[in-house]
């Protein structure tokens, strides 16, 4: 499971669909609707919030908006109605760590996306996040 800090625009089609499915799974976990994945490290920043379901729902909206922009049809009725009204702080080094991880994936599976984005030094974050100074998060498996 990977709940990307980077903006969904950087994901190739396969990555965008995977992000959608994994975030839907995360929503299910955060609602308590499944017993698996409850301790997955990618969920830590969502679980730390007062209303984790609202936060993951807002995360899903960002993915769905990118999908719609590309002409994809993701079933947005699967997104919980709660919304997180603020922007979640995430660190610059977490964003850059994930950027490197994504670039490696794109180099292997979607060279055209890699070529399009490889010159970007600091990517935009997912709309849910605002970037603050800091290290890679402890929950990240490096």
Identify what each model region corresponds to.
Residues 1-16, 22-25, 29-33, 43, ...:
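Sequence termini and other peripheral, non-core segments
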């Amino acid at each position: 499971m990977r709940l990307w800090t980077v903006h969904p625009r950087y994901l190739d089609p396969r990555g965008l669909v995977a992000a959608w499915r994994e975030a839907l799974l995360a929503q299910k976990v955060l609602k308590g609707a499944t017993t698996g994945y409850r301790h997955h490290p990618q969920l830590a920043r969502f679980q730390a919030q007062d209303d984790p379901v609202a936060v993951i729902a807002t995360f899903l909206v960002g993915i769905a908006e990118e999908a719609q922009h590309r002409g994809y049809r993701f079933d947005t009725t699967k997104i919980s109605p709660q919304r997180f009204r603020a922007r979640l702080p995430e660190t610059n080094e977490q964003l850059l760590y994930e950027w490197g991880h994504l670039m490696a994936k794109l180099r292997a599976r979607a060279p055209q996306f890699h070529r399009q984005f490889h010159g970007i030094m600091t990517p935009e974050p997912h709309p849910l996040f605002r970037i603050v100074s800091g290290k890679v998060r402890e929950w990240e498996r490096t």
